[in-house]
A protein has these predicted regions:
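Boundary at the C-terminal end of the N-terminal hydrophobic targeting segment
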Residues: 9-11, 15, 180, 196
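Acidic/histidine-rich, surface-exposed loop or edge segments in extracytoplasmic proteins
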Residues: 13-21, 33-45, 84-88, 184-188, ...
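Cleft-lining beta-strand/loop regions that shape enzyme active-site pockets
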Residues: 24-25, 38-51, 191-198, 217-236, ...
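N-terminal-proximal low-complexity accessory segments that begin disordered
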Residues: 25-68, 75
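Extended, small/polar residue-biased N-terminal targeting/export presequences
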Residues: 50-56, 63-138, 190-245, 306-308, ...
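PDZ/PDZ-like domain segments forming the peptide/carboxylate-binding groove
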Residues: 65, 87, 101, 106-117, ...
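Conserved functional hotspot residues or short segments at active or partner-binding sites
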Residues: 122, 172-184, 516-673
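Polar, glycine-rich mid-to-C-terminal structural blocks
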Residues: 460, 472, 477-545
Length: 674
């Protein structure tokens, strides 16, 4: 997906560009491209064969990020791109050239502006018929490119009808008439397109080039890197979320643990923000087509004030209907990110719940040997000691929505539950493998344990969950994890022998994938993630969230296991016994039955490839989705997964007392992972 740039001071003074403007790479950009190609070839974990296949991959990725829904380019234009550049991008890559990218981007700009003007005129003049049995194709990714302008414009007209119906039945606080709102969106988008520069073309092409190696590799121009360090961190003030632009939309890229958005549990990674309103009754301003800096300016505000966000939820594959959420602005502090505990009752058994939003570490405090410095492992260790004193029958470690953090803390936290031993393996691009171990033989807690995960549990969370699973130390419950099992490093692009150069312009930075994580079993968490022992259905759409949704993600592979002689507590038979009890409970759980029914309704909506533009049918679908989403987003709605997990931990405690959960001398992965 194409990431539109953060605005800079210069963009405000750029005059509207005519469609015949042709962008070309500057000398500094050409030089940066030369070094970028060398860095990718020399340092990236993936060894890429530079040939015509790479040319095709980069071209396909570039066309997809510019025009994923096949809305701008015609088939004849794509054919010309393939003829001109389909077998030469690899040669340009080795030569450090970006000519192909600039040519394609120039055509994209012309076509995109053409569409925006068409849509604006259409909304001014057309009379739309919503009683006809028309349909709109939602999944255009695998469709053919339009063969001519007439076919293209027919699709544009259907798109306008779909957008108008979506706005009409968005459900809440739509002050303006849908046609007016939609026209303004296209005007905003056109304005943004007319302010594009050669820097934007260079950025877009290099995004396609670098993400062809893997989705976490990227190039930062000097301005981009400043935005990466400063502007995006400033955007945390207010709601605690990182945002990025994808075409005309502002998209949530990350939810910061402990922040207002995290605590509200209403905003998710991948949600599109289409409107922003202030306080309880302020106007919802449509922000589709806005520059991201302007959107951030609306979202930020005084601590304690309320911001209302109109979103297209990722849970509905961003198709709509939209939903309005309310978040109270606040600061994000380390204290808010800290692990927290509660004790819940399950049929007379006390179950301790430890919520870990992130793997945090006060590096400065650790470096200076402060006795009270904060870290995940230290905080959780204290909580476990408290829970033991309170006499809990079992513990749940909740890692849902935990995107990772300090690797050191994942290793130390695992060590609270196991004797000393290997936790994770790290392999670099030269096939060197380092084993990270828990060096502390003490076990803080050795009782019944469950680890909760979901699709947003990533990186360090997956390392801990995998280790607990491979040791047979606890049961993993929830949904398959994200699958982020790689390590990135940011390198500054430097000229060799820089003192020979008169031009000392900054060439930017490159973020490279340089290593992969592997379980002690030898399997990689990359791409596949961690599959729970007991799977719980989820509202999260695994088709749009997760490492395996990226076509260029590094695949999972296997290296040698790390042998260890520690016995496993939970064998295959133990897990099967827990599953049996769990499934028996679900048969009589009416809340779970309603949950599954609503999930099936949502899944059928997500999987729709074609949607009706016949207004009564469209409204009926929208009402049904809004109804169950409103139910499950109530603040007082029970945490169903936590409730079921408490039952499973209680089962572990019960089976342990009956000596039905026993250890074994074989390596855990030989016992558990058959």
């Amino acid at each position: 997906m194409f990431l539109l740039p953060l605005a800079d001071a210069q963009s405000k003074t750029v005059a509207a560009l005519s469609d015949d403007i042709v962008f070309k790479a500057s000398p500094v950009q050409e030089e940066a491209e030369q070094y970028l190609s060398r860095y990718l070839m020399q340092y990236h974990f993936r060894r890429v064969a530079v040939n015509d296949s790479l040319s095709q991959e980069i071209l396909a990725r570039f066309l997809e990020q510019l025009d994923e829904t096949k809305s701008y380019f015609l088939a004849s234009q794509v054919e010309q791109f393939n003829k001109e550049t389909g077998k030469s991008i690899d040669d340009q890559f080795l030569a450090g050239k970006a000519d192909a990218g600039f040519r394609i981007y120039n055509t994209f700009l012309s076509q995109a502006k053409k569409k925006m003007r068409f849509m604006i005129d259409l909304l001014d003049t057309a009379r739309f018929n919503f009683t006809a049995r028309d349909t709109f194709d939602l999944k255009r990714k695998d469709a053919l490119w339009p063969s001519n302008s007439a076919e293209q414009q027919e699709r544009w007209m259907r798109e306008a009808k779909y957008q108008l119906l979506t706005l009409k039945y968005s459900g809440e606080e739509e002050d303006d008439e849908p046609r007016k709102v939609l026209k303004k969106r296209y005007e905003n988008r056109l304005s943004l397109l007319e302010k594009q520069t050669a820097d934007d073309a260079f950025r877009a092409y290099n995004y396609a080039l670098t993400t062809s190696f893997d989705p976490h590799t990227s190039y930062f121009s000097p301005r981009d890197y400043e935005d990466f360090q400063i502007d995006m961190s400033r955007s945390l003030e207010g709601i605690g979320a990182k945002l990025q632009s994808e075409n005309e939309y502002t998209v949530v890229n990350e939810i910061i643990p402990g922040g207002p958005a995290f605590k509200s549990d209403l905003l998710k990674k991948g949600d599109r923000i289409v409107g922003v309103g202030q306080n309880a009754g302020g106007e919802i301003i449509d922000v589709v087509g806005w520059r991201i800096t302007d959107v951030v300016r609306l979202i930020r505000g005084k601590k304690g004030s309320t911001v209302r966000l109109k979103i297209l939820p990722v849970s509905q594959a961003n198709k709509g209907p939209s939903r309005i959420i309310r978040i109270v602005r606040d600061e994000v502090t380390l204290e808010e990110q800290s692990a927290k505990k509660e004790v819940i009752d399950h049929n007379g058994k006390k179950i301790g719940v430890i919520t870990v939003p992130a793997f945090y570490l006060d590096f400065e405090g650790q470096k200076n040997n402060r006795p009270d410095y904060k870290s995940t492992s230290r905080d959780v260790g204290k909580i476990l000691t408290e829970l033991k004193k309170e006499g809990v029958d079992g513990v749940i470690l909740d890692l849902r929505n935990n995107g990772g953090g300090a690797l050191e803390e994942a290793v130390k936290l695992t060590g609270l539950f196991i004797p000393e031993g290997p936790v994770v393996q790290v392999k670099n691009a030269r096939d060197g493998v380092v084993v990270l171990r828990d060096e502390d033989a003490d076990v803080v807690y050795d009782g019944p344990l469950a680890v909760l995960v979901n699709r947003y549990s990533a990186s360090a969370s997956e390392i801990l969950a995998a280790a607990i699973q491979d040791y047979g130390r606890g049961v993993i419950i929830g949904g398959r994890t994200f699958g982020k099992g790689t390590v990135q490093s940011i390198l500054k692009i430097n000229r060799p022998f820089n003192f020979f150069y008169k031009n000392n312009d900054d060439l930017g930075q490159v973020k490279l994938t340089v290593a992969k994580f592997y379980r002690i079993s030898g399997e990689s968490t990359q791409h596949l993630g961690v599959t729970p022992d007991i799977i719980f259905p989820s509202f999260i759409d695994s088709k749009v969230v997760g490492e395996d949704t990226y076509t260029s993600s590094l695949r999972s592979d296997v290296i040698s296991p790390v042998r260890n002689s520690e016995p496993t507590r939970l064998t295959v038979d133990s897990i099967n016994a827990l599953r049996k009890r769990y499934n028996e409970r679900l048969k009589t759980d009416s809340l779970y039955a309603r949950y599954v029914s609503d999930l099936n309704t949502l899944k059928s909506f997500r999987d729709k490839e074609v949607i009706s533009l016949y207004e009564p049918d469209f409204k009926a679908d929208t009402d049904r989705i809004q109804g169950f989403e409103a139910q499950w987003n109530k603040e007082d709605e029970p945490d169903l997964l936590l409730k079921e997990s408490a039952g499973i931990v209680a089962d572990i405690a019960d089976l342990s007392k009956k000596s039905l959960i026993v250890g074994g001398e074989a390596a855990p992965w030989q016992t558990r992972r058959k």
